[in-house]
């Protein structure tokens, strides 16, 4: 018999990501001034203290009420999808846990300070990517995993239709 929900694994992932996110942001916020930067991997990775009161790339800057409302809706929707659509599917449950943790990590920043602490500053193939944080990484990985799960599910359905 397969487990319907992997609650322990899902909670562990979400708690770990949120704690790691908040601890790294706290270290950056308390040890670096905004704009301070140091090189970790030459021409690829810097740690740069930055604040963002919008979404990715500063979109919707200063719209905190919007972010509060939309984040609460997203967190509730993620719990709903976890319960309704991720049954017996550890892969999907991990993906949803990463999305939940990422959304919660940035939500905590917005509640406490009205802005998100960003610090991971990368230069990928000559493109100076916008500065981001652990929560953003968790969101991105969660989205990628959900896309993979959906593509895999679509592929499995096509295989079953052929048989």
UniProtKB/Swiss-Prot annotation:
Show the stretches that span the lipid bilayer. Answer: 11-31, 63-83, 88-108, 131-151
| Alphabetical list of Pfam families matching this protein | Peptidase_A8
**Keyword Transmembrane helix among record annotations:** yes
Q: In which pathway does it act?
A: Protein modification; lipoprotein biosynthesis (signal peptide cleavage)
Q: Which InterPro entries match?
A: Peptidase_A8 (IPR001872)
GO molecular function terms here?
Answer: aspartic-type endopeptidase activity
Active site, UniProt feature: 118, 136
User: Would you identify the family this protein belongs to, as annotated?
Assistant: Belongs to the peptidase A8 family.
Name of the protein described by the UniProt record: Lipoprotein signal peptidase
* UniProt source species: Staphylococcus aureus
State the organism's lineage.
Bacteria, Bacillati, Bacillota, Bacilli, Bacillales
Q: What gene is this protein translated from?
A: lspA
């Amino acid at each position: 018999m397969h487990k319907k929900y992997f609650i322990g694994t899902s909670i562990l992932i979400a708690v770990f990501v949120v704690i790691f996110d908040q601890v790294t942001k706290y270290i950056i916020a308390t040890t670096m001034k905004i704009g301070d930067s140091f090189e970790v991997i030459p021409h690829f990775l810097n740690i740069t203290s930055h604040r963002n009161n919008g979404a990715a790339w500063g979109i919707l800057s200063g719209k905190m009420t919007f972010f509060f409302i939309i984040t609460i809706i997203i967190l509730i929707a993620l719990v709903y999808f976890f319960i309704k659509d991720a049954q017996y599917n550890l892969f999907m449950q991990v993906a949803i846990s990463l999305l939940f943790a990422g959304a919660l990590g940035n939500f905590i920043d917005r509640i406490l300070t009205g802005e998100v602490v960003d610090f991971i500053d990368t230069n990928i193939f000559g493109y100076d990517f916008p500065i981001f944080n652990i929560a953003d990484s968790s969101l991105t990985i969660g989205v990628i995993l959900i896309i993979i799960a959906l593509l895999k599910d679509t592929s499995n359905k096509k295989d079953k239709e052929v048989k």
